[in-house]
């Protein structure tokens, strides 16, 4: 973060002195002299309990929901909502800079699309990106606070659980272009219908300037029904839709990556290669290409830069341990992403394929159907065994069994490990995927300790 006067950073929240602010922090362990410390109340940890210590350690201002003992009143900024205060400060800071920025949202594929955007934009200049999936009221501001005078490009991921959240984030970030990857069933539990999810994702439009490009998936069933503001420039990307502005044709995908041609109605045809397996990642690459080229970046260089993509975290990360190929995809899960991950497993050359799949959360009334379909898709992908983990995954195991798959349903992590030890052997390919709170990442790390090293 570049130094900014407190009265400028905190404008709209309080009348502050023009002291120099060098950072905005929410973790008391990262407090440094000249920072603003923001207190977030939580179920397990309440930031207010650390406010006095933060002030003693050099914080210039404390943003809190109520007065805090040990912090002078003239150094306490009282706000009703810490998240909205973070957004306001980030918006004030964002006004100091003018990078070309892409905002990314959607039900599935946000983080992969963000990483493709980063690969493309980095080919043209210094680029800032959302780290991990820091895409909420804290993560988006923290990304924006990393802007500096020499930032030429940026890509910001925006997530949501409820209506109104994307609007708040996009008005704060004010991207130059937007991407909506697809509309699925993630967060159906909170929003009720896919149509409501569509409305929530379309909120990204409110932060885009007049004439801004908005890249949308032409193959998604709902996005073509969206009402797009006439002041924006929609650019449709896809594989199947013949009328898409940017299409992928001649797609060949395998364990080591995917090749295809980009057919662009505006700029021509380009060869593309990406180091990812699965046709779903082609959509993510197309989205990044479409948004970047409509910001005026050279199309041939954008297409070539897709090859520099690198996988992050436990998102379809393919590794080999003890002679076994693992697809680590433990961060999140929805029916759409399960189907995509199973297609990657199917494409691997290993003789035997095993799926370790856990519960998908926040699906609401679509939960049983989504888990049942996942079991059917596992069978269609030719898995030799399915280990289903969690109460919701019983339907998954039953559906796979009905299709002739050797499937078991586990209620505990120890049961899962027992079946993994029983089923998995060197030479196998194993897909590991579930919602993050199911803890499959930790379970997988435990199993790795049992495998031969080297």
Please annotate each region the language model reported.
Residues 77-81, 407-416:
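Short acidic-hydrophobic, aromatic-tinged amphipathic segments that line or gate anion-handling sites
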Residues 35, 54, 89, 104, ...:
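Residue-level signal for inorganic ion chemistry
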Residues 42-45, 311-312, 330-405, 454:
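Active-site beta-alpha connecting loops in nucleotide-dependent enzymes
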Residues 64, 68-73, 179-326, 350-351, ...:
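Acidic, Mg2+-coordinating active-site environments of NTP-dependent enzymes
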Residues 5, 85-214, 218, 224-230, ...:
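Phosphate-binding loop of NTP-binding sites
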Residues 1-88, 348, 376, 381-391:
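N-terminal leader/targeting and accessory segments in enzymes
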Residues 104, 313-315, 437-443, 454:
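ATP-dependent carboxylate/acyl-activation modules
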